[in-house]
Amino acid sequence: MAGVIPVWIALVATLSVFLQGINVKAATFDITNQCPYTVWAAASPGGGRQLAKGQTWTIQVAAGTTGGRVWARTGCSFDGSGRGTCQTGDCNGMLSCQGYGQVPATLAEYGLNKFQNLDFYDISLVDGFNVPLSMTPTSTNPNCKGRITCLSHINSMCPAELKVNGGCKSACARYNTAQYCCTGASANNCGPTNYSKFFKGQCPQAYSYAKDDATSTFTCPSGTNYKVVFCG
């Protein structure tokens, strides 16, 4: 029996290190509203919550989560059961989102520990624009890009053909063609258009169309936490 105890101790120690490694890769997202109006924050995964100016909602995101996004909904009305509608960013009429929202919406996107122990994060206008936002990783690692923003008030400058109540659709969302959505015959040969150049001119760090990776994707070491701020 004397030899059994050290074996179990070793197994427990190994498991502890393994679990610590998982925790390091998980992330906390602090989502704050600095807009002079109420927004209904949404996260997939995460759900949703009403935020008055100055309020913060904190969510925990599991290690290895990819395809994650955070956005603001505007012009919402919900009943006591959490059912209702939003003018922009609506997710199937639910306060607590179970999936992605409707266009237009400014997106803070991320993939945790997606490749070589790196998180990937970006701001996307591929679904259009509704609320200015910034995304800031908390890491001070020099290999981390840092804060990225899209703080231009695009709604007031939106081309008439893309304008909707409370937001500005992307050309892909408005016309749904291969040229603007980089699909079909355009999937591997898709460049910027006058519409995407408009969005890029307003928010140079944000995705302006689906293939805008080179100037719009940023990385941080896995285990980083993030702050998303609407209007700030």
From Swiss-Prot:
PROSITE patterns: THAUMATIN_1, THAUMATIN_2. The keyword Amino-acid biosynthesis does not apply. Strongly expressed in roots and in female and male strobili, and, to a lower extent, in cotyledons, leaves, stems and pollen grains. GO terms for biological process: defense response; response to salt stress; response to UV-B. InterPro entries: Osmotin/thaumatin-like_sf, Thaumatin, Thaumatin_CS. Induction: Induced by UV-B and salt stress. Disulfide bonds join 35-231, 76-86, 91-97, 144-220, 150-203, 158-168, 172-181, 182-190. Residues 1-21 form the signal peptide. Glycans are attached at residue 194. Keywords: Allergen, Disulfide bond, Glycoprotein, Pathogenesis-related protein, Plant defense, Signal, Stress response. It holds the Pfam family Thaumatin. Belongs to the thaumatin family. PANTHER family: OS03G0233200 PROTEIN. May be involved in disease resistance. This is Pathogenesis-related thaumatin-like protein 3.1. The lineage of its organism: Eukaryota, Viridiplantae, Streptophyta, Embryophyta, Tracheophyta.
